[in-house]
Regions:
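Alpha-helical cap/lid subdomain in secreted, periplasmic
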Residues: 69, 74, 81, 103-231
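Conserved SGNH/GDSL esterase-like catalytic core that processes O-acyl groups on lipids
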Residues: 24-39, 47-133
């Protein structure tokens, strides 16, 4: 039963290491904006630099058809309708996921995201955490340290999400969110629906199993339904 539950997760064969090449893991959009400051903390679904060897030639959330259609840019557009002067930061932390057990050792590379001074943090991490022998207690401990690092004065509202594909760590995220009184956006059902993926659009099966435009739209809509309360 467990193997069936996580079958979609196992189709994510995109290497979790070095997803950005030599590109920076922290990027900004309208850094000096005077409106709400939104930080996206994520992985390849949030941002993946070009990787021609798997047929991915773009520099946005895998596997949207264009920049405007990934969930980050859809949320940016929705926020800007309310606050045209909003500021945004993307912190791509797939490397943290792969070694979450010792994730604290990696936090220094995210210092620029810490200095951004976020008002809202969208936590979109779990998919690249190794599912075999996943340690929920260690994950919660390290996630808390990471979020505390990115939110040093505690002013930011953190919004948690579960995996796009069902993951053994989803329960740890939900438990952490409940104990910290944080909103949780569940996404795992999307990864069970091939219409939410980029199936048939990429030869590499791992890329194709990432969210396509419809999946990205659904991710953005679910997050914004919670996020708008804090704008």
């Amino acid at each position: 039963m467990q193997n069936e539950q996580y079958a979609s997760m196992k189709k994510n064969t995109v290497d979790s290491r070095n997803q950005l090449g030599k590109d920076p893991c922290v990027r900004f959009d309208t850094y000096n904006g005077t409106g709400p400051r939104v930080l996206f903390l994520g992985n390849s679904i949030t941002l993946h630099s070009p990787r021609p060897e798997v047929g991915w030639h773009d520099d946005w959330g895998m596997a949207a058809s264009c920049e405007e259609n990934d969930y980050v840019h859809l949320l940016k557009a929705a926020v800007r309708e309310l606050h045209p002067d909003a500021a945004f930061c993307v912190c791509q932390a797939a490397d943290w996921e792969t070694v979450y057990q010792t994730g604290s050792e990696m936090m220094g590379r995210y210092s620029e995201a810490r200095e951004f001074g976020a008002d809202i943090i969208i936590m979109r991490l779990i998919e690249n955490c190794p599912g075999l022998h996943f340690d929920g207690d260690v994950f919660k401990q390290e996630l808390h340290r990471l979020l505390s690092f990115l939110n040093p004065d505690g002013k930011a509202q953190v919004i948690l999400t579960t995996g796009f594909w069902h993951h053994p760590g989803d329960g740890a995220i939900i438990d952490y969110g409940r104990k910290q009184s944080l909103p949780i956006v569940e996404l795992g059902d999307l990864g069970e629906d091939d219409s939410m993926k980029a199936i048939g659009l990429f030869e590499h099966s791992g890329v194709a199993n990432h969210p396509g435009d419809l999946g990205m739209k659904m991710i953005a809509e679910r997050i914004f339904s919670v996020m708008k309360t804090y704008l």
